[in-house]
């Protein structure tokens, strides 16, 4: 599969997952996106009406796809360039990395990593000490569960 199809597949699977939890989440994620770092945002609300007064914030989101021969159980790893991590770190807000590993359209698994500023500082310090251009980072299996409103 060509890279644009891999990215599009990953974005579609992420959008489907957000739709499963649509009561409190809205996504604005583009495929074939040409922005430097992020593919879009996930907006969080504390009420299913999703009016401005119920807006809680947005999560900067990067979606990656990877075609694999087999979906492995448990968590996984994903390689990301140090230059990209440095760009995320300049924003000082954090980034939600969503990775879709798939065999085909029906056989896939979503993973995530919360790249918070404190985590990015630590990852970058370790990568620079070892003079690395890329870093394999832990990504966690996205468990299918309903997201509930905090009281």
Residue ranges and their predicted role:
Residues 87-151:
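Acidic metal-coordinating catalytic centers involved in nucleic-acid phosphodiester chemistry
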Residues 50-54, 85-91:
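Short, charge-rich binding segments
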Residues 57, 73-82, 108-118:
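"Short basic amphipathic alpha-helical interaction patches in structured regions
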Residues 4-79:
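Catalytic centers of nucleases
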């Amino acid at each position: 599969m060509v890279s644009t199809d891999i990215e599009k597949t990953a974005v579609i699977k992420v959008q489907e997952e957000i739709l499963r939890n649509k009561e409190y989440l809205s996504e604005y994620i583009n495929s074939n996106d040409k922005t430097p770092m992020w593919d879009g945002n996930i907006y969080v609300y504390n009420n299913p009406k999703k009016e401005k007064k119920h807006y809680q914030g947005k999560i900067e989101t990067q979606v990656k796809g990877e075609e694999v021969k087999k979906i492995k159980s448990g968590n996984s790893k994903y390689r990301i360039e140090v230059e990209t991590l440095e760009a995320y770190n300049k924003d000082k807000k954090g980034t939600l990395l969503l990775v879709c590993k798939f065999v085909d359209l029906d056989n896939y698994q979503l993973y995530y990593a919360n790249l918070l500023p404190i985590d990015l500082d630590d990852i970058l310090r370790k990568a620079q000490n070892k003079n690395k251009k890329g870093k394999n980072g832990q990504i966690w299996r996205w468990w299918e569960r309903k997201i509930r409103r905090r009281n």
